[in-house]
A protein has these predicted regions:
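Intrinsic-disorder/low-complexity detector
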Residues: 1-134
Length: 134
């Protein structure tokens, strides 16, 4: 699967990417939740992103405050900023079926990127521990 493409021309694609970052922020900030952002908002966000992304952004502001690691918090803020900047000047009010597919693609590709970034951070930590033990 390809990774997130910040140069993709579809605003719907970047809306999906923003959704993925919001979900990742919640996952890091709150380990045990009854219903995730994705479970609650994915369907409506993929149809009416202008309405839903504002609500999710408010939740993410709260979740970001809960992330104790300042470096990690800034990484997520920067990723979220990149996704929103790539949307352009207007968040689409509604999405056609084709645009919903681009939303899903952006969501999945950003999830892949975020997981890859996380795996790289874990690998660096493991390597640092190995170096210290030698």
């Amino acid at each position: 699967m390809s990774e997130y493409d910040p140069k993709n021309k579809s605003a719907a694609y970047h809306c999906g990417a923003a959704m993925a970052v919001h979900a990742a922020i919640q996952n890091v900030a709150m380990k045990n939740v009854n219903a995730t952002i994705v479970q609650r908002y994915y369907s409506s966000a993929s149809q009416m992103p202008a309405l839903v992304l504002g609500q999710i952004s408010r939740l993410s502001a709260y979740h970001l405050e809960k992330i104790e690691n300042e470096w990690l918090r800034k990484q997520y803020e920067e990723e979220l900023n990149r996704a929103y900047c790539a949307i352009g000047n207007e968040i689409p009010a509604t999405l056609t079926l084709e645009q919903q597919a681009y939303f899903a693609l952006g969501y999945r590709q950003m999830c892949t990127k975020l997981q890859k970034d996380k795996n790289e951070r874990i690998e660096k930590i493991k390597n640092n521990v190995k170096d210290q033990n030698m």
